[in-house]
Amino acid sequence: MTKKALLGLAVALLLPITCYLMLKYASETAVDMPRHYLLDTVVTRVDKGKMITDSIWHKTANIHLQNQLGDSVSLYDKEGKIIVADFFFTSCGSICPKLTANMSKLQQSFIRGGDLRKKVDTSIVQFISFSVDPQRDSVPVLKAYADRFGVNHDNWWMLTGNRDSIYKFAFEELKVDKFSTEPISPDFVHTSRFVLIDKEYKVRGYYNGLDSISISKLARDIGLLMLEKDKTQKSAVFSEIIDLSWLWLIIVLLVIFFVLYMQSRRKLNG
């Protein structure tokens, strides 16, 4: 076998590994996932002799309230779901109707299904609107308001309950007053912000619910979070491919060694 043929054989054997590694690198670097926002602490640990720094992101605490159907519900009832939250009150004559209308359009876009629906089940998205005037916004009032905007009750809650709990949740858990250019009074949560929460109850984005560009970004980020996997766990397929890549490498080395050995024997016999 000539050197040219040997090179061709090596390329043919190494090509599957090379393609896999290139695709893996491209898939990991091509898309920027929505960032985390609320940092609790930073911890350091030693792993195999190396100092590793881990960021511990704030996990949103649970809250128990009542929805527009009169059901007692909690945030943690929606385990494994991506959540889009906002704050409103039914008697609002300024921004709230527009916020609710935009949230409704967002919900309907996922119900009908876009390109993302071909790959992922959009039923994992939950919309939650917290009333900041719960004394007036009773269950019947919320139900009438929801029906007015064509709310699908299956994955959109409008919640009422204890005012202090709602306000504490807004400021201490979702921190709606942070990363904002608009002033938000601690006495009345009147904000145009939509908050994106991932499957682990961690805040992944703040958006202007009155701005079409910001809402489009929210829709995109929802899709990205739907595709997000637990990075701490390697998939079985990935592990098998890694094992096979070592097998390919061993085969290549054996073939090259065998070819070189046969060539050396021919020279000796010649």
Outline where the language-model segments fall.
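Thiol-/selenol-based redox modules, centered on thioredoxin-like
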Residues: 182-269
